[in-house]
A protein has these predicted regions:
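Switch II of P-loop NTPase G domains
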Residues: 2-7, 30-35, 58-75, 238-239, ...
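N-terminal accessory targeting/assembly segments
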Residues: 1-110, 114
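Short, acidic/turn-prone active-site loops that include or flank metal/cofactor-
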Residues: 111-115, 233-234, 363
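Switch I (effector-binding) loop of TRAFAC-class P-loop GTPase G-domains
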Residues: 1-3, 189-190, 196-200, 221-252, ...
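Conserved catalytic network of the ASCE P-loop NTPase/AAA+ motor domain
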Residues: 9-10, 77-79, 100, 243-247, ...
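Short alpha-helix plus adjacent loop in nuclease-associated cores
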Residues: 112-131
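C-terminal-of-GTPase-core extension/linker across diverse P-loop GTPases
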Residues: 1-17, 38, 137, 141-213, ...
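Conserved Switch II/interswitch segment of TRAFAC-class P-loop GTPases
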Residues: 22-26, 56-63, 90-93, 261, ...
Length: 394
């Protein structure tokens, strides 16, 4: 009798992406936004098989896209046996319910997807509590469309963390859990605040930037330690702090979660304690991926997030990373314009901005000595101001 073998591998979920091109958005921007959403889906562990877009003044109140476009999506999802549809925006509870009723597959919005990735990345008790709190706050207004009890975990993307709840009877359970998590995080915050006070005398430098720009690689290079660095969105979730010494001047360098366009407000709120490393830093090192076609949009996103957490007025060193991957043909102001070279951008940026900036490649070790010298000079200014009698160090 022949022995039968069964494939026990978990089937990779297949996803369709949906985006709306609103007034003021270009086709190129919409394409870039969906590419980022595809990267998010890949980071979560699924495969994107098709994208749908529609030009609208604003998303449809009932179904996000128009009824005709929704029919197109439904036909494709049914014919290709798609597992889930992901929308590049936050859906209202009613939109989510209406779309689910129409498509009869798993529906995720951008916020749910990002929260799910955070749930998969969280390692420490603090990060896990922060993510769970954000997920429950996202879940609470959406209780009426959920079908699984809170304690019954359902697998797959969008289902990690606290799971899903059945109906209003679970509202009290979720509210109690939210209260418990807030108390737990307050206790962790007090411990973290004590730790920060203990190291307050040292100059503190925080790496900030859009997700996947190379912050952790720079952290490893400067601190000569191994911090997890990967070509995935949100590879770093928990804050890492290392002591660094350049030319006899010591300082603390922290690497924390990367920012992203449309970062869920639940996450910004719940991660405020983690972002205290940024808020309380003396100097911010803003890392930019200059090889990215829309790096200037990413700069704007980071600046808006810094403003939201109360850190916009900090001293900033801008580090344009990945110069080895810069391609002039991807950077032009208008369709017919000449491509912008790296030299052109350096000249224009330096002319417009007074804050210090430098262009490097962390992976290829290009211009690293100048980068270290720039950090040294900026840290020395703060250090000298704090310790005026330490001048013999220099």
């Amino acid at each position: 009798m022949k022995q039968k073998f069964y494939d026990t591998a978990v089937k990779q979920e297949r996803a369709v992406l949906v985006g709306v091109i609103t007034q003021g958005e270009t086709d190129e921007q919409a394409k870039e936004y969906l590419e980022e959403l595809e990267f998010l889906v890949s980071t979560a562990g699924a495969e994107t098989v098709k994208s749908f877009t529609q030009k609208l003044q604003r998303p449809d109140r009932a179904t996000f896209v128009g009824s005709g476009r929704l029919e197109d999506i439904k036909a494709y999802v049914t014919a290709e046996e798609i597992d889930m549809v992901v929308f590049d925006d936050e859906l209202t509870p009613s939109q989510l319910r209406n779309i689910e009723n129409e498509l009869q597959v798993k529906i995720l919005d951008r916020n749910n997807l990002i929260l799910d990735i955070f749930a998969g990345r969280a390692q420490t008790a603090q990060a896990k509590s922060q993510v769970e709190l954000a997920q429950l706050q996202y879940l609470l207004p959406r209780l009426t469309r959920l079908w699984t009890h809170l304690e019954r975990q359902k697998g797959g993307i969008g289902m990690r963390g606290p799971g899903e709840s059945q109906i209003e009877t679970d509202r009290r359970l979720i509210l109690n859990k939210i209260s418990l998590l807030k108390d737990r995080l307050k206790s962790i915050d007090r411990q973290n605040e004590t730790q920060r006070k203990n190291r307050h005398q040292m100059v503190r430098v925080a790496l900030v930037g859009y997700t996947n720009v190379g912050k952790s690689t720079i952290m490893n290079m400067l601190s000569k330690s191994e911090v997890f660095a990967e070509n995935k969105l949100f590879a770093t979730l928990d804050t890492t702090v290392r002591k660094v010494v350049i030319e006899n001047v010591p300082f603390l360098l922290s690497d924390t979660v990367g920012f992203i366009r449309k970062l869920p407000h639940q996450l910004v709120e719940c991660f405020k304690s983690t972002l205290d490393e940024v808020r309380e830093a003396d100097i911010l090192v803003h890392v930019v991926d200059i090889s990215h076609p829309n790096f200037e949009d990413q700069i704007h996103t980071v600046q808006e997030t810094l403003k939201e957490i109360g850190a916009i007025d900090k001293k900033v060193i801008t580090v344009f990373n990945k110069i080895d991957a810069f391609k002039p043909e991807l950077h032009s102001i208008e369709e017919q314009a000449e491509p912008i070279t790296l030299h052109d951008f350096k000249d224009s940026w330096m002319a417009k901005n007074n804050s210090p900036a430098i262009f490097i490649s962390a992976t290829k070790k290009e211009n690293i000595d100048a980068f270290r010298a720039l950090i040294y000079n900026e840290v020395k200014v703060v250090h000298t101001d704090r310790y005026p009698y330490d001048h013999l160090l220099y």
